[in-house]
Amino acid sequence: AGKRFAWMGLWTAWISTAIGFYYAVVTGWCLKYFSAAASGGLGQGVDTTQVWNDFLQDPSQVIIFQFLAVVITMAAIWRGAKAIEKVNVILMVSLFILLFSALFLSILMDAQDGTLDGFVYMFSIQPEYLLEPQTWISGLSQSAWSCSAGMGMCITYAVYMRKDEDTTLNAATMCLANNSISIIAGLTVMMAIFSVVQDPLSAVSGGSSAITFLVLPEVFAQAPGGPVVQLAMVTMFFLALSFAALTSMISTIELCVRNFVDHGVDRSQAVGFTGGALFLFGLPSAALWILMDESTGVAFPQFLEVQDHIWGYGLMFSGLFIAFSIWKYGWNRYKVWQDENDIVGFNWQDYLDNGVSSFRDDFINTGDNDWWIGKWWDYIMYLGFPIMFAILMGSYFVDLLLNVDNPWDPTNPKGITIVLLFWGVTAIVFLFLNRWLVSRPLYRNVPEGAEVPIDTLPGGEDDMILQLGEVWTGGNLDNSSESTVLTAELA
């Protein structure tokens, strides 16, 4: 997008990292419940509300499991791309096996009365919810999070890809796999709940945390087959949930680590620094502002929920900034085309032919992709996305103003002021850091054997972008960084 907009990249990296601060706490919850399930602490007759309240209101327990989640994540990414690939292969294969096993048991449970009402509810449509802005906002945020859309994940992992990688097929496969797993997980949960809970609609309306940590342990404790099957089912579920959380943590934190590495920081130092920050900045979400809902008697982490609200919705701006870089690239290519052909003045048709389609032609339809992407992609990117973004964000803020008491009160965790304050301060700080960002070199890591000259890659002719192993001799860095030389990670 240009050097003036480097702060947008920092925003994208920060949003992902900020989500990681509190997501490490959530991952710790999953690990805690897996250990409790495996030891028989979530069996029949256990008061799951009491288990949840005791755990959440004991900061030492929450922090211990948060620390464990951080350590596992840092260990997985310490050695770089190959280690990440091996860990993810093990975790994802295990996740599939565990999830399908739990789905099979849930189908048996739901089919006992011959109705499959959990399956029916899962795919039933309630038109009134389609008219609520919150439905679409939540759906977009969930999609952005689960597919890593707008988080810069694919941009980060691109440094490990071959030049001839079929990114189109990979993106389609990723979305298909993600949505398939989401449907399978939803079916597993819904069919299990509807099979044993007397008031399933009340159970599923309590939110994802209530369903996961309060309802499901009770549901699995009543599964047919006796104590052995019940223990296996609840243990498998929370082990699968822990694996899913850890894979998300790995990709989220690798984004932060990789950005440090690209700016010349040794990987071991980047992992150590990021791990320390992840733990320290996650402590407030683990221990602060733990409240009790008087109507239900269930504890909830108010500080964590506020952070999730702020940075989760901030993902939409990350997506906007990435889209902006595509728009800017198209405009720059159009101006270059004008200069090369001595054309003066703006022409819509010329812009559509030589500007709008340029990103698709240069980076998507490279000749290495099996699925050719047509002009429909341009319409979605240039028209569909900005219109959708404007409508959803406008609806979101209108909904806050109309349906939240005292929305302008900065102490209101559900108000509009606290969201704008966090977003605004973050954007201002990053704008001030923009000059510092563009004065530092970036180190490009071409995998061994790729044999791709750096000047043939996008941005390779920029004197601020160096091949891994080259020495930076510029004068804008401090003395400790003037002669940074990095060694390849991908041996």
For each predicted feature, which ranges?
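A generic transmembrane alpha-helix motif of multi-pass inner-membrane proteins
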Residues: T296, Q302-I322, I373-E461, G469
